[in-house]
Amino acid sequence: VKGRQVFDSRGNPTVEAEVFLDNGISATAISPSGASTGAFEAHELRDQNKNKFLGKSVNNAVENINNKISSKLKDLNSDDQSNLDNILLKLDGTENKTNLGANATLAVSLANAKCSALSNKKSLFKNLGKSFSLPIPLMNIINGGAHADNDLNIQEFMIRPDSANNFMDAIEKCFIVIQNLKKLLQSKKMLTNVGDEGGFAPSINTNEEALELIVQAIEKSNLKPGKDVVICLDVAANELLNENGEYSIQSKSFAPVDDVINYYKKLTSNYPIKSIEDPFAEDDWNAWKKITNTVGNNVQIVGDDLFVTNPKRLDKGIKEKSANSILVKPNQIGTLTETLEVISMAKKANFKTIISHRSGDTEDTFIADLAVATMSSQIKTGSLARSERVAKYNRLLRIEEELGNQVKMAKI
C-alpha cells in the first residue's frame, strides 16, 4: 500500500492511496473533504504546519499509510474487506480515527475494494452488491451559505427529477432546468459563475427569491414543478445557530425553533419542496423530532451533520424518530465496511439513503458504484458542471449502459 499527497477540487491537499496485489493488479482511491463539517465526523488529519500549504498538507496521513498501515496489510486477501477495515480500526484505536486520520483509512479502504473488483474481473458495483438500481440525482443549482459569497443563508437549493424514466432522462431534465435558470439569471443581469459544487451563486438576498427562480426555470423547461421536478434544500443549520439556540434561516435575524418550523411549513406549502437536509443543528435533537413529526409525512428530512454516517448517532435518530433519511458520506466514518453497515441499518429502519460527495471532491467515482450497489434511492454529487461532479454522472451512465434493461431507477 502506498500513500501520496494529491489535490481536491478546491486545490487543497488530500490523500490518495494505491493498493498493489501480488497478481499485478493495483488501484487508487482519493479521500474528499468537506467545507461545512459536522463536529462528530471522523477526524481528517492535516499537518497544521503553517509553512506547508498554510497548514493544510497531509504528509502525516500519507506517512501513516506508508509506515504504519502498509506493513499490517501484507498478505491480506483483497476480497476480505471487513477484515482489512477491522485491522485499520484496531491500528487506529480511537473512536473517530484521530491517530491515522479518516482521510488515510478511507483512501486505503476504497482502493482495496477497487482492487478486489479488478481481481474478480467485475465492475466495482457488481463486486459490492447483488441487486442494483440507479439513484435519482439531487442536483445542486443555487449555492448559498458556506458554499458561496452571497447573502443566501440556505446552503444548497437542489432539483430532483422525480419523473425520470432512466438515468440519462434524469440528467436531461436537470440539464434543461439548469440552462433555463442560467438564461433567467442572465436576463436579470445576475452572475452565472459557479460555486464549489457547480451550482450558480448569484447575488440573491432571500430564500424565496431563489425558490421563485427555480420554479420559473422548471416551468420554462415545460416540466411540472412538484411532479416532474421537485426542489430539495440543504440548510446546513449548524452554520446558522446562535448561543441562545436560535437560527438565522429566514433572514439575518435569529428566530426560535418553533418559528423556524413554521417557516419550513410555509416554504413546503408554497413551493414544491420534497426534501430538507440539516434543518436544525447537529445537537438539537428535539427540534429534529418536531420537524419530522410536523412535515415528515410529505417531506424527506435528511440527517447529514446530525448523523455523520455514524451508527451510534443513526441508532439514536431511529429510536427518537429524528429524521426519515440519511446522507451517507464515506469520509465521515472512514472505512467502506462501516459505511455499508450504516446503509444497512438505515434501510432496516425504512430510512432513505442518499449517497453524497463532499464540496472538496475529486475525480474519484467510487460513490457512483456505491449508490448502485446499495440500491440507494438518491445520489447527491453536485451540479452538471465541474469535472469532479460530472465524473460521477458519467460513471452512472456507463453503469446504466452495462446493466441495460435489467436496471430501473430507484424508488423515492
Q: What do the PLM-derived regions correspond to, one by one?
A:
Residues P32-L118, K122, K126, I171, ...:
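Metal- or metallocofactor-binding catalytic centers and their adjacent structured scaffolds
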Residues V15-N23, A27-S33, M139-P161, L233-L240, ...:
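Short beta-strand elements
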Residues E156-F167, L191-N207, A236-Q250:
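Active-site-proximal beta-alpha loop/turn segments in soluble metabolic enzymes
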Residues E208-I412:
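Catalytic core of soluble alpha/beta enzymes
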Residues V1-V15:
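Short, Gly/Pro- and small/polar-rich lid/capping loops
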Residues F132-G195:
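Mobile "lid/hinge" segments at catalytic clefts and subdomain interfaces of large enzymes
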